[in-house]
Swiss-Prot record:
Signal peptide: none annotated. GO terms for molecular function: D-alanyl carrier activity. It holds the Pfam family PP-binding. This is D-alanyl carrier protein. It comes from Bacillus velezensis (strain DSM 23117 / BGSC 10A6 / LMG 26770 / FZB42). The lineage of its organism: Bacteria, Bacillati, Bacillota, Bacilli, Bacillales.
Length: 78
């Protein structure tokens, strides 16, 4: 499975919403799909699944606001 699809699967699990896979440009915070607790859960899931540590200080909602942006940021950190 390609990295992008794996990230979208993790995001869909955390958000409990397949819309993140169907529309990778959806604004996940604006749409209420992810909140601060979900953000922590997502960062832990990313670290567990991919071994990528994202310091909370590096997490800017404006840069991590869509599934596509999340994939791009994680690709940079890989």
């Amino acid at each position: 499975m390609e990295f992008k699809q794996e990230v979208l699967d993790v995001l869909a699990e955390v958000c409990q919403e397949d819309a993140v896979k169907e529309n990778p440009d959806i604004e996940i915070f604006e749409e209420g799909l992810l909140d601060s607790f979900g953000t922590v859960e997502l960062l832990v899931a990313i670290e567990n699944r991919f071994g990528i540590t994202v310091p909370i200080t590096e997490f800017d909602r404006d840069e991590w606001n869509t599934p596509n942006n999340i994939v791009n940021k994680l690709t940079e950190l890989k």
